[in-house]
Amino acid sequence: MSETISDPYPLTNPNAPLGHPGHLNSTQQATLDSMRLELQKLGYTERLDDATLLRFLRARKFNLQQSLEMFIKCEKWRKEFGVDDLIKNFHYDEKEAVSKYYPQFYHKTDIDGRPVYVEQLGNIDLKKLYQITTPERMMQNLVYEYEMLALKRFPACSRKAGGLIETSCTIMDLKGVGITSIHSVYSYIRQASSISQDYYPERMGKFYVINAPWGFSSAFNLIKGFLDEATVKKIHILGSNYKSALLEQIPADNLPAKLGGNCQCPGGCELSDAGPWHEEQWMNKN
């Protein structure tokens, strides 16, 4: 069995839009009930809660058949990847060393209570990274962190916010990224993005791209026509004058100083993992 959450936390959010737990019309409720019933008939017993099934349904615009196919594909991948074993046994001992060449970390929350995730692509040096770790372990760590997001971070954030939190606020820093470095990490980024999109759908709350190089906004304008309107509204492409935009969404005390905030965690924000998930009154007790 995989790790489970034994401590209660809010299962709905009064401010959530239609299609989220506690905010369904009659058609959506019927589709949710049908999806759960079909999966139970197929022998599935885990991850059949409303919040999980609704994420798959929203990702497929409440098309029952497509949502079922997506869920079943995800369950097959979880078994093949060994996700349940990963949750119990994975240890990323090289994390601090990896962080020097590829900083990626969760750090406190935004004004809506979402965990903030920071990724700094400009620091990536795959040659040095692969002297410390392997592509396989990097992917395992990615999946492990997604699981901890669901098992520990979201429940703690939900308790503190007083309502269900099921998305994160991402800051992707492109400072120092050039054409050469983008090409070298494209394979990893593509694989990581595929895992996120296919197996952890509807986890994006806000997405800020900062220090975007010249031409990035134009390139994004070309592809945003293929994205649904709700997704486009979540994405903000910013240049080097990003500080005010970030501070509108993230309290200064929660934003690392190197990104324009006031926070200077001892030992560095990128290794602190500071947030409600480590605060006694909000974290899982078991």
Swiss-Prot record:
GO CC entries: cell division site; cell tip; nucleus; prospore membrane
Ranges of residues in domain CRAL-TRIO: 94-267
Main location: nucleus
GO molecular function: phosphatidylcholine transfer activity; phosphatidylinositol transfer activity
Annotated region (Disordered), positions in chain: 1-24
Keyword Zinc-finger: no
Record keywords: Membrane, Nucleus, Protein transport, Transport
PANTHER family hit by this protein: CRAL-TRIO DOMAIN-CONTAINING PROTEIN YKL091C-RELATED
Function as written in the Swiss-Prot or TrEMBL entry: Required for transport of secretory proteins from the Golgi complex. Catalyzes the transfer of phosphatidylinositol and phosphatidylcholine between membranes in vitro. Essential for viability and secretion.
Protein name: Sec14 cytosolic factor
Lineage: Eukaryota, Fungi, Dikarya, Ascomycota, Taphrinomycotina
The encoding gene: sec14
